[in-house]
């Protein structure tokens, strides 16, 4: 399948600066607080979107991008934190699926009974795993496995408005969701794209 209009997202400048510099006939378009850079690469129309950080920003930026530019496909990419010991800095995770690691139900407790996050249970939103597009997944797998020098993993992206730094918590999340890494945007993008029926995929390079 040929994609003529491709929207590529990143939350921060460091995730999109290189891509912006590759654009020919570049045009910057600002909508609300969200920046889009339209141009061409290899005769394809490419839109680079700075989504800003977080699931809500990613959802808004994706909705704007779809409405304004009518992309054939959306690629969400950027950095992520590893959730498995065999995944290291510089490795890449391709998001075959994406899940919400920040949506829980909690047991009822009275005052002074304390709190224990390990007792929290994923709620129905967390269990609604979002899938990447099969054709995109196949294409990305072929390109990265052929050309990338570090390890490439395929699996579930964990995503939510949380920055986990506690190893026991990270291990619990990994055991609960089976995710390979965590970021703060993917779930908003996957959910929005699936609602609009726009093919999408997430690609994350491990930064920590």
Q: Model features per residue range: what roles?
A:
Residues 2-63, 69:
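N-terminal short beta-loop-beta anion/metal-coordinating cradle
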Residues 12, 81, 98, 158-162, ...:
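Glycine-rich beta-alpha junction loops
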Residues 32-34, 53, 97-100, 205-208:
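Short, acidic/turn-prone active-site loops that include or flank metal/cofactor-
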Residues 162-208:
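A C-terminal functional module that forms or caps the active site or interfaces directly
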Residues 84-177:
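Mid-sequence, gly/pro-rich, charge-dense loop/helix-turn segments that line enzyme active sites
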Residues 46-51, 154-158, 203:
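Active-site-proximal beta-strand elements of phosphoester/diester hydrolases
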Residues 70-75:
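Proline-aspartate-enriched helix->loop->beta-strand connector
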